[in-house]
Curated annotation (Swiss-Prot):
Species assigned in the record: Shewanella oneidensis (strain ATCC 700550 / JCM 31522 / CIP 106686 / LMG 19005 / NCIMB 14063 / MR-1)
Record text on subunit structure and interactions: Monomer.
Annotated EC: 1.3.5.2
Catalytic activity: (S)-dihydroorotate + a quinone = orotate + a quinol
Protein name: Dihydroorotate dehydrogenase (quinone)
Active-site feature positions: 175 (nucleophile)
Functional note: Catalyzes the conversion of dihydroorotate to orotate with quinone as electron acceptor.
Binding-site residues, substrate: 66, 111-115, 172, 177, 246-247
GO terms (BP aspect): 'de novo' pyrimidine nucleobase biosynthetic process; 'de novo' UMP biosynthetic process; pyrimidine ribonucleotide biosynthetic process
Classification of source organism: Bacteria, Pseudomonadati, Pseudomonadota, Gammaproteobacteria, Alteromonadales
NCBIfam families linked to this entry: PRK05286.1-1, PRK05286.1-2, PRK05286.1-4, PRK05286.2-5, pyrD_sub2
Associated pathway: Pyrimidine metabolism; UMP biosynthesis via de novo pathway; orotate from (S)-dihydroorotate (quinone route): step 1/1
Any single GO CC term annotated in Swiss-Prot or TrEMBL for this entry: cytoplasm
Length: 339
């Protein structure tokens, strides 16, 4: 009931202003008595993923809490993990406003945020300050003004700084809103990046006597051949996990709607089938060697179950969480326990 009232108010506001207000409110209430307005008890449904044990298979996707400001609040809601970021080595403002659009009839969102964040040093401070022991993944990317050819340096800088504070690290090369970023998904650039990241992971594991798993987040706009090539690169470089998928550049299912022609990545219900298809293809290519987090268009427990059936070990929600609220977490966990 509380979420429906809050949502009604928020949906009258500019989407980015509403988002910032929500994150700010959650930051202030996350670990105090006011979190009773959204906290919920969820029956544990432990799942093993990348050598880690999560209390349940439902996580918050990257992009919601870029700077790790409201982690404790999302823990109170019952998420099994939170993925913060995307974070870059240096702070950056992101793309020009407006850059976030609701497509309410389709339960969808278009964004062209452009990795707006306060930088990796600020994120680390927030990770240290969090009060709860929730599993936190850190999604890392490159700064907009870093040439693609030097992009791996940005990922390595972020790895160095977040390594001791992350349950796992997610490598984002699939956002459509940073020029040239998706080119890192192909050919020599992909192999060079994954090789460098794996070498850095092993170096840090030896230095700190702690192994932090690494996952790669991929786009939904890939051919089967491109998916096969990514799978082979993941296996070759001994990555620990994959996250499928990011937002799509397609506009299937939103034609004619207000804001449908805005540039950026489309998320939400129109992405459901495409994301599930990519998960299934990726799982087939990986042959059980590397586990997958399924994300993209999960608007119901049934959508999540389809991701599990396609080969995902865990799932993440974002747009569906905005449209459905925290109850979606509980519904998915209950369905998972019964499957």
């Amino acid at each position: 009931m509380f979420y429906k009232i809050a949502q009604k108010v928020m949906f009258q506001m500019d989407p980015e202003r509403a988002h910032n207000l929500a994150i700010g409110s959650l930051r202030m209430t996350g670990n105090g008595p006011l979190n009773a307005f959204y906290a919920q008890n969820i029956t544990p449904a432990p799942v093993s993923f990348m050598g880690l044990t999560f209390p349940n298979p439902v996580g918050l996707a990257a992009g919601m809490d870029k700077d790790g400001e409201s982690i404790d609040a999302f823990h109170a809601m019952g998420f099994g993990h939170v993925e913060v970021g995307t974070v870059t080595p240096r702070p950056q403002p992101g793309n020009d406003l407006p850059r976030l659009f609701r497509l309410k009839p389709a339960k969808a969102i278009i964004n062209r945020m452009g990795f707006n964040n306060k930088g990796v040093d600020n994120l680390v401070k927030n990770l240290i300050a969090k009060k709860t022991d929730i599993m936190v993944g850190v999604n890392i990317g490159k700064n907009k003004d870093t040439p693609v050819e030097q992009g791996k340096d940005d990922y390595l800088i972020c790895m160095d700084k977040v390594y001791l504070h992350a349950a796992y690290i997610a490598v984002n090369i699939s956002s459509p809103n940073t020029p040239g970023l998706r080119s890192l998904q192909y050919g020599d650039l992909l192999d060079e990046l994954l090789s460098a990241i794996k070498a850095k992971q092993l170096e840090l594991a030896d230095k700190h006597k702690k192994y932090v798993p690494i996952a790669l987040k991929i786009a939904p706009d890939l051919t089967i051949e491109e998916i096969e090539n990514i799978a082979q690169a993941l296996i070759k470089n001994q990555f620990d996990g994959a996250i499928a998928t990011n937002t799509t550049l397609t506009r299937d299912g939103v034609s004619g709607l207000a804001n449908a022609n805005e540039s950026g990545g489309l998320s939400g219900k129109p992405l459901t089938e495409l994301s599930t298809k990519v998960i299934k293809q990726l799982a087939t290519c990986l042959q059980g060697q590397i586990p997958i987090i399924g994300v993209g268009g999960i608007n119901s427990a049934e959508d999540a179950l389809a991701k599990f059936d396609a080969g995902a070990t865990m799932v993440q929600i974002y747009s569906g969480f905005i449209y459905q609220g925290p109850k979606l977490i509980k519904e998915i966990v209950e369905a998972y326990r019964l499957k």
